[in-house]
């Protein structure tokens, strides 16, 4: 499943609605938002999240909101009496650290709950089990990291996700956007530090290989080209390549990698059959070994 983010620090506009519709048409099925706000903005935030939830219902999109204990208090919400939360139209909550796990376990019988994947421990799992949490409503979601050099290490992430998957959790992580980046740093919002600067599709493909069940765009938007590339990959497994100075015969075509995969190049199944790029004989030269 792929999703995207819509933040509530600014008013929701017709452009926001149009972007959501374009993403839904491209195959995205979930929206993430954040309810971490100053207390004096609580009324405005409540109005905006209700509006966002209404748009999500119209577009058949799930809506998960990140919230802390401070955010709950500012909005006048309590996990013990979740009627006000459900009234907004939220699909579920992504729970920040510091919120009582017994209350989380109880909430899981009412709505989906995403736990903090990066900090979840075996003791936390034991507490949730002791409080009879509904495991069909529990998932494990990682953070994004706005500041360069602070994102997660790939090896650590792979190990943590393997553990979470073994426990039965669906995991989620963020990939960077390539459109409007979220401020104030505007340095992209990936989960893995190695993905900072990558295209959304490249990061998505990498996360899919690391036990990641849900993948969301962290930044405000992605470009129409990225939307189309992700839609093609999710629908057919096709990877869209953008190249410059390529022969016209190569562009706009569907190509397949050979089953005997080469280490350093892509060898096309169609290469011999089509003979699109005949090459004149040249003196043989040794290829330097690349480790």
Regions found by a protein language model. Name each.
Residues 1-17, 66-76, 186-197:
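Active-site mouth loops of central-metabolism enzymes
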Residues 2-8, 31-33, 61-67, 91-95, ...:
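Hydrophobic faces of well-ordered beta-strands that scaffold small-molecule active sites
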Residues 8-12, 35-39, 67-71, 97-101, ...:
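Active-site-proximal loop/turn and secondary-structure-junction residues that shape catalytic pockets
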Residues 11-24, 74-84, 124-128, 199-206:
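Short, acidic/polar
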Residues 29-52:
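Glycine-rich, proline-tolerant flexible connector loops at the mouths of alpha/beta enzymes
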Residues 46-91, 100-103:
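N-terminal active-site wall of soluble small-molecule enzyme domains
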Residues 118-245:
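Catalytic alpha/beta core domains of metabolic enzymes, predominantly
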Residues 244-291:
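C-terminal functional modules
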């Amino acid at each position: 499943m792929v999703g995207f983010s819509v933040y509530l620090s600014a008013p929701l506009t017709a452009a926001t609605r149009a972007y959501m519709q374009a993403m839904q048409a491209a195959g995205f099925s979930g929206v993430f938002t954040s309810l971490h706000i100053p207390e004096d903005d609580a009324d405005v935030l409540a109005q905006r999240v209700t509006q966002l939830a209404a748009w999500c219902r119209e577009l058949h999109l799930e809506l998960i909101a990140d919230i802390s204990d401070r955010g709950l208090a500012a909005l006048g919400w309590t996990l013990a009496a979740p009627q006000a939360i459900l009234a907004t139209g939220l699909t579920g909550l992504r729970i920040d650290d510091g919120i009582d796990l017994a209350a989380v376990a109880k909430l899981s019988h009412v709505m989906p709950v995403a736990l903090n994947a990066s900090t979840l421990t075996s003791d936390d799992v034991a507490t949730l089990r002791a409080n009879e949490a509904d495991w069909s409503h529990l998932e494990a979601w990682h953070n994004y990291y706005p500041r360069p050099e602070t994102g997660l290490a790939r090896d650590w992430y792979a190990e943590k996700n393997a553990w979470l998957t073994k426990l039965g959790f669906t995991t989620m992580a963020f990939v960077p956007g390539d459109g409007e980046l979220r401020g104030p740093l505007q340095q992209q919002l990936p989960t893995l530090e190695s993905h900072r600067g990558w295209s959304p599709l490249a990061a998505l493909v990498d996360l899919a290989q690391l036990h990641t069940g849900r993948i969301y765009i962290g930044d405000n938007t992605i470009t129409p080209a990225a939307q189309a590339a992700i839609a093609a990959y999710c629908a057919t497994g096709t990877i869209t390549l953008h190249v410059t100075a390529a022969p016209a015969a190569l562009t706009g075509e569907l190509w397949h990698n050979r089953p005997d995969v080469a280490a350093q190049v892509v060898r096309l199944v169609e290469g011999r059959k089509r003979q699109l790029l005949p090459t004149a004989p040249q003196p043989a030269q040794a290829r330097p070994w690349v480790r």
